[in-house]
């Protein structure tokens, strides 16, 4: 078959974000010997420009919506939403990284190149229409993330977190790939739409094989989104990794993994939903409960936010349990809101942690409202959104998820989710009380002024959080139009 029959100009346009990110990641590596890393922010500037170009490329690719490369990729509203989201997360990761890398004397091209490669993998995950392409995107993103977690080579905590992340991540990937093998063996295809057709056809394979495949993939993806009972890696990795990397891991890879979670289970496995639904609601309940109650006992803010991340994965799993387009749209909205509020909170942690990241405890935030009222106000917005207070993105995110659950008659799961949200309010409010009601700690008393990059890293997520809380309809409308995944 001629290459021209497989690849055309439209295919290149649909693949544009991944091309830009991959090429620019390589360009950064080539420029490393040329640029004076100690006196220049050039790596960060090039990375930001690359991400902005990829963002524009994602929007432009949507004008050529359709399948690419023989159906291996699909550019639709769902893919575009998550492409834009993970690239935005990348931009918000680079902004606080300027000071962090300079403070740790760790400014190299590798950091930014790995970030671009990881985001390229996440974009591929969002647009993949075949299980093998999903696997490739997953591995590109994961391998880059493993290295980023251990980027500070002289930090024992970072090395330990990277090793745990790599070992457990590889184990989870094995489960996912084994599930792919079961699906291919039973249906003869790895195309998601073709798998759906095979499971609904007259010669549908044995439900035993497809059920095992769904369970294996659930285990692999459950690890990637840090959902219970596969969450054990998250607190240690989030605490040990460099804080900007932790912010990135908590938002970008999680959003991309949920994108393929919904793409696979709401497309390929939709005909056997009665089989996998119990797995999802059990995981949702465990994630919300374990995450929130474990967070109550944390003194380290990064560990607290790690357990909070587990709980928020549970809320998204509630949307998946709903098994509806409304639930998918609600999850899309929630992941966008969560990305803004979580990455903003980690940006504040990065700002206060100091050289060597020694200030990470809740008590270290004492007096922040007195010493840096703007920083405290930004963190307050993020924490209130994580609670789900009205006029924030977190409120409408939870509202739409629980609304979708009620429409699917999941009353008991909705009630338990609301109770868990009440529990979560305690540990978020505790941090607010410490910031405003206590005398300044050494960390806040000696905190450096906000740099331009950090100001942007705080104001942009805060703006996104408030916009989604005050004007949620424009995002929700697009998510609603993009939520029907069965092609």
Task: Show which residues each predicted segment covers.
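Alpha-helical transmembrane segments of multi-pass membrane proteins predominantly involved
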Residues: 1-487
């Amino acid at each position: 078959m001629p290459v021209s029959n497989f690849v055309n100009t439209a295919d290149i346009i649909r693949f544009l974000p991944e091309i830009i990110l991959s090429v620019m990641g390589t360009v950064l590596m080539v420029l490393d010997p040329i640029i004076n890393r100690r006196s220049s922010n050039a790596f960060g500037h090039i990375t930001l420009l690359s991400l902005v170009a990829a963002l524009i490329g994602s929007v432009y690719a949507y004008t050529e919506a359709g399948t690419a490369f023989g159906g291996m990729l699909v550019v639709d509203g769902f893919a575009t939403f998550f492409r834009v989201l993970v690239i935005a997360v990348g931009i918000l990761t680079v902004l606080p990284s300027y000071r962090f890398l300079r403070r740790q004397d760790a400014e190299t091209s590798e950091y930014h190149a790995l970030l671009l490669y990881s985001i390229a993998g996440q974009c591929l995950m969002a647009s993949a229409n075949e299980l093998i392409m999903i696997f490739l995107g997953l591995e590109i993103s994961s391998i880059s993330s493993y290295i980023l977690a251990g980027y500070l080579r002289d930090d024992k905590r970072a090395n330990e977190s990277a090793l745990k992340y790599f070992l457990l991540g590889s184990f989870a990937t094995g489960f996912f790939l084994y599930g792919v093998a079961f699906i291919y063996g039973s249906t003869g295809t790895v195309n998601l739409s073709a798998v759906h057709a095979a499971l609904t056809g007259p010669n549908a394979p044995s439900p035993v094989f497809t059920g095992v495949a769904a369970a294996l993939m659930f285990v692999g993806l459950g690890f990637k989104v840090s959902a219970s009972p596969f969450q054990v890696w998250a607190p240690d990795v989030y605490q040990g990794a460099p804080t900007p990397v932790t912010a990135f891991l908590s938002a970008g890879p999680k959003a991309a993994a949920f994108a393929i979670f919904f793409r696979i289970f709401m497309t390929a496995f939709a005909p056997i939903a009665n089989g996998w639904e119990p797995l999802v609601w059990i995981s949702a309940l465990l994630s919300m409960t374990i995450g929130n109650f474990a967070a109550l006992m944390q003194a380290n803010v990064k560990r607290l936010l790690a357990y909070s991340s587990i709980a928020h994965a549970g809320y998204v799993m509630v949307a998946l349990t709903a098994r509806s387009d409304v639930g998918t749209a609600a999850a899309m909205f929630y992941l966008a809101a969560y990305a803004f509020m979580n990455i903003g909170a980690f940006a504040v942690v990065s700002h206060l942690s100091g050289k060597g990241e020694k200030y990470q405890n809740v008590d270290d935030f004492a007096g922040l409202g007195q010493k840096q009222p703007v920083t405290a106000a930004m963190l307050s917005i993020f924490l209130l959104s994580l609670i789900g207070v009205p006029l924030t993105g977190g409120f409408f995110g939870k509202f739409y998820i629980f609304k979708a659950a009620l429409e699917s008659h999941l009353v008991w799961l909705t009630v338990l989710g609301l109770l868990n949200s009440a529990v979560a309010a305690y540990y978020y409010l505790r941090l607010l009380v410490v910031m405003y009601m206590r005398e300044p700690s050494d960390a806040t008393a000696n905190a450096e002024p906000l740099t331009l990059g950090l100001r942007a890293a705080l104001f942009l997520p805060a703006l996104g959080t408030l916009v989604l809380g005050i004007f949620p309809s424009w995002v929700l409308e697009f998510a609603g139009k993009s939520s029907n995944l069965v092609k």
